[in-house]
Amino acid sequence: MITEKPHHPYYQQTVDETLTNIQSSLDGLTSAEATARLEKYGENALPQKPGKPGWLRFLAHFNDVLIYVLLAAALLKLIMGHWVDMFVILGVAIINALIGHIQESNAEKSLQSIRNMLSSEAVVIRQGNHETIPTTALVPGDIVVIRAGDRIPADLRVIEAHNLRVEEAILTGESTVVEKSSDALHGELPLGDRYNLLYSGTTVSSGGGKGLVVATGGETELGHINQMMSDIEKHRTPLMVQMDKLGKTIFITILVIMLALFVFSLIFRDMPVSELVLSLISLAVAAVPEGLPAIISIILSLGVQAMARRKAIIRKLPTVETLGAMTVICSDKTGTLTMNEMTVKAVITADTTYRVEGDSYEPVGNIHPVDDPTPVTVTQGSVLERYLRTVDLCNDSQLIKDEQGLWKITGGPTEGALKVLAAKIPLPAIDAELRSKIPFDSQYKYMSTLYRLGDEEVMLITGAPDVLFRLCQHQQTQNGLEPFNLHYWEEKIEEYAREGLRMVAAAWKPAASGQRELTHADLQEGVILLGIAGMMDPPRPEAISAIADCLQAGIRVKMITGDHPQTAMSIGQMLGIGNAASAITGRELEAMDDHQLSEAAQKYDIFARTSPEDKFRLVQALQSKQEVVGMTGDGVNDAPALKRADVGIAMGIKGTEVTKEAADMVLTDDNFATIARAVHEGRRVYDNLKKTILFVIPSNIAQALLIIIALLAGNLIPLTPVLILWMNMATSATLSFGLAFEAGEKDIMNRPPRKSNLHVMDGYAIWRVVFVGLMIAISAFVLEAWLQPRGYSAEFIRTVLLQTLVTAQWFYMLNCRVTDGFSLSKGLLANKGIWIVSGVLLALQLLIVYAPFMQMLFGTEALPFRYWIITFLIGFAMFMIVEAEKVLTRRWRTTKG
């Protein structure tokens, strides 16, 4: 905690005001005062909640109504002494819990990553003396000595700075080094613009200084993020909610039927209680799709592997299906929608405006006048030659080609863009000698070099146009010098700003003969403007097509950037973002209440000058409108927004570890197109999950109906619990994997996102599973009725029924391949998974029917070959009936409109 908050933020106060408000001095605190404050405010450490132990998280996976049914069945089997059945049923419950536990994402890791960012020791000034203390002992009012390489131990107000530069990417995601000063700042500023504050967890890249501790522990920026991460409750995914509802529905239905049958059988059939309980256990086990949770987890895992091959790492399994329901993607601009390679697109001189071709650091692309596509040739002494020479030599960056043949720059992106520009056209050779340099500094916003160029001695200057305009008295033209025309240059800047270009000016001045030193005073008069360059971070070509795909798929793309609104709108229009004609700023968002924000979140697609806090509120606002939100981020302070989003998307290259831990998905290439590919894969996986659910449940319905009919008729129970578990775990699970490998259907990205509240078991799905379940049950019942009078043993009849149900399932799996179309399409041969699982199923059936130890364990008998033919024909007939049902349903839907 910190001392009482001042009326103005610390960054708006002078050093003396801050020291007074926090009751400290340049000599630091006394030992007694430090001890008192430590007792009052607590240790400088992030608060943490105790995590659940592993065994408790494992037991939580038994908290499911369907698992309750299995555990109750196992307990009854134990009481009745049926050990084999008990172990098999209990084993199924444990396997399901193990799979869920293994796949569970440990959310505590993201909080631990934040805590790991804190340093262990700090050098402080107390009573005028330097002391090294544990960072946990820091208190508000301590003076911390800062050196290059240090990790900042608390939030500090800079009171002394010597070329102090800090790497804040770990907090903000911005890769540029921030220069710090002790000067007071004015107005409300976002976190990244508070140049006199140092934040806990960031790193000093160069220079040094001193800082006054203004916040410790949970009151630091890092502490606020830690608290937000602890408080955020992750939304349960639509599928998780639906499967819970489905489980409860099945549970209640089973309970009602079992009670009704128990009463009916006792009154009208006079069955022994022990026999009745065994029959009802069989019914419970038959009606519960035991394998479904494991099947869903494994299909999602296969989706994770497929996405990893497409450069999207899924960290939390349910994310795979959530991607298919996503309605909005909020994406950062730099590096995700754009190339993160600043590129010059225009050069403006007093005589001519040039267009520059090329969209990357590769030094390829012509330069030509805007009204003439003919490439220019640079001649010695021309204005363009002098301009290109200036931006090349007044430049600290380097253009290099790496081992993979890719062009890269070292240094800042703006200087890098100018270096690439100069390399696009060969300049006439000239002997150049650097004599002196004034490095770029954010305080004066320009850079200057003193060169001898051949026989000429010149000062070269590059920097912000508004700064250089104040220094210039003349401008260079093809005909020599003429008075500086401010109106002309301001018009050009306004014109190209509308295209989203950032402007950099270049100028020169003759130097005195033999001059060896360069000072700021040398540049205060006599400077001649050469021109300005307009540059931008160009859109990724693949992002443009990916956004078009998303819009086609009914997904709105919203761009979030720290850029100026005009620049943001221009980039948005190039990308093809929906409503790119208007933008809203972070400051406007901050002034809105929750209702106004939810309306603005729906209305606007371009969000400029935004902060990570705006991102968090934006996610909440969109979710309040029932949107399923994907959010990208890279800095630590993006982590709460990512954790809150339905799909948090972290950048794999420039993202921090904390952000990656908080995210559901990590892009290994930081590319928006990868998100679009992941959406395609998510929809495919969801389709296959739905097909799998439609495939599994009819078998349970058929098994349950067979037992219900037998109880009502007072007949032999056709299937034992272990045979039912064999069907549900071995047969259903095996065949389900064939559907998991099914390719996406043709219209997968031409349909809108599914509604998150739309149940996987919609009206048509319920009709289908009931229809198929009844058909399988009736077929098996008729076959059983035909076999019983012929004197076959109970074991033989059960084996024939098992074979009938398994064969019917295999054919129905083929039906489920395609939702509406004919299932025996050419894609059937392309899906190798179906043929692999078919082979495995055949081997399993041969084993359970003919292997003596399996016959003993499961109570089966060997079948003559003719019964394989009979069951095959029954299955094929059902396949054709379901295909006919699909045709009729399709026609009915078409007629209905």
Go through each PLM region and give its residues:
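Generic alpha-helical transmembrane segments
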Residues: 730-731, 776-777, 799-813
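Membrane-water interface at loop-to-transmembrane-helix junctions
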Residues: 755-774, 794-800
